[in-house]
């Protein structure tokens, strides 16, 4: 799938007055060989996180993982699914996020409630602490008859931004910076004030076109002869400028509904000039269905299905969207094989 054609260029066009929620906005800074994405989440992420009664730190961590998944998945030129999954020894054992092109998202978390409560009581519920040590896997699934591609990076007690930087540094050799922000917004409504989740993110990558620009400083090979020192190639000035600008982005700028993505990009890159492309919409949408759950149940041996019966019915709850499907045991029983006609 080819990169969309430019829709507008800043600063030749006035930025949008307000933020467009639930969108992905690609951009390019040609003068510095930089490309990236800005993601703004409003109702979609509120829908996903509000479906579950997660503790606030768990919901915030899952929100960050959702933003990271969309930032990474939307850079790939394919039709299919991008899945981000963590498995670790921290209080939050697993995060699973599905991004299906062009913009459907679902997500869930598994966690130890007692350990999360203890971490919150001790004031030690930072994302890196909740994750602990383990790994983060990113899988590209383009559908039947295609091979899956998977990239893995270690989780080392640090946050998801750090994990993303390490992955691109060591696996893709692409200088990358990621900023993630998630928070609750207190909003007045007819029946009283209510908390709503908001999230935002920024991805910036250095993809030089000119040969004189170094793409990535060399990593220490670990086998430098004794008596010699490894001399890494210095970072390109364009990348130093880009990552330094991203480091100035505050959480509020990624979350504020009164600051559009275009305004944020203009603030960061108005001197070299920034071009934005057509935005894409994001939706909270699960792929589960009654028919799909029924097929899944029929795939189990009959003995397993018999053990699923409670109070005369089989109940299945989707971990992603919390939808519940109830079946009578006979609904998912395989038909008895027909007997041959004795005549």
Residue ranges and their predicted role:
Residues 3-278:
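Interaction interfaces in information-processing and related assembly proteins
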Residues 243-343:
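Cys/His-clustered metal-coordination modules, chiefly Zn-binding fingers
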């Amino acid at each position: 799938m080819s990169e969309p054609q430019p829709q507008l260029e800043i600063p030749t066009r006035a930025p949008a007055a307000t933020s467009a929620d639930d969108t992905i906005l690609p951009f390019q800074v040609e003068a510095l060989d930089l490309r990236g994405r800005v993601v703004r989440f409003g109702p979609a992420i509120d829908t996903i996180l509000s479906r579950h009664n997660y503790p606030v730190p768990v919901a915030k961590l899952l929100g960050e993982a959702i933003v990271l998944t969309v930032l990474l998945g939307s850079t790939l030129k394919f039709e299919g699914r991008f899945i981000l999954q963590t498995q670790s020894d921290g209080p939050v054992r697993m995060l699973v996020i599905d991004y299906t092109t062009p913009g459907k998202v679902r997500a869930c978390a598994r966690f130890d409630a007692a350990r999360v409560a203890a971490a919150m009581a001790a004031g030690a519920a930072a994302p890196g602490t909740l994750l602990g040590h383990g790994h983060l896997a990113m899988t590209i699934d383009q559908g039947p008859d295609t091979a899956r591609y998977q990239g893995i990076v270690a989780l080392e007690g640090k946050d998801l931004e750090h994990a993303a930087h390490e992955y691109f540094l060591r696996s893709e050799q692409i200088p990358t910076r990621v900023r993630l922000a998630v928070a609750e917004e207190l909003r007045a409504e007819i029946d009283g004030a209510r908390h709503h989740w908001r999230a935002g993110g920024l991805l910036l990558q250095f993809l030089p076109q000119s040969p004189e620009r170094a793409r990535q400083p060399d990593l220490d090979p670990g086998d430098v002869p004794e008596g010699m020192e490894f001399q890494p190639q210095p970072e390109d000035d364009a990348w130093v400028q880009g990552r330094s600008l991203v480091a100035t982005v505050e959480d509020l700028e990624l979350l504020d509904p009164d600051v559009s993505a275009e305004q944020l990009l203009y603030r960061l890159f108005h001197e070299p000039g920034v071009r934005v492309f057509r935005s894409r919409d994001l939706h909270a949408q699960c792929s589960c269905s009654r028919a799909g759950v029924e097929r899944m149940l029929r795939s189990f041996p009959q003995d397993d299905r018999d053990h699923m019966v409670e109070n005369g019915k089989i109940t299945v709850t989707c971990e992603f969207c919390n939808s519940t499907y109830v079946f009578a045991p006979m609904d998912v029983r395989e038909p008895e094989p027909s007997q041959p006609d004795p005549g």
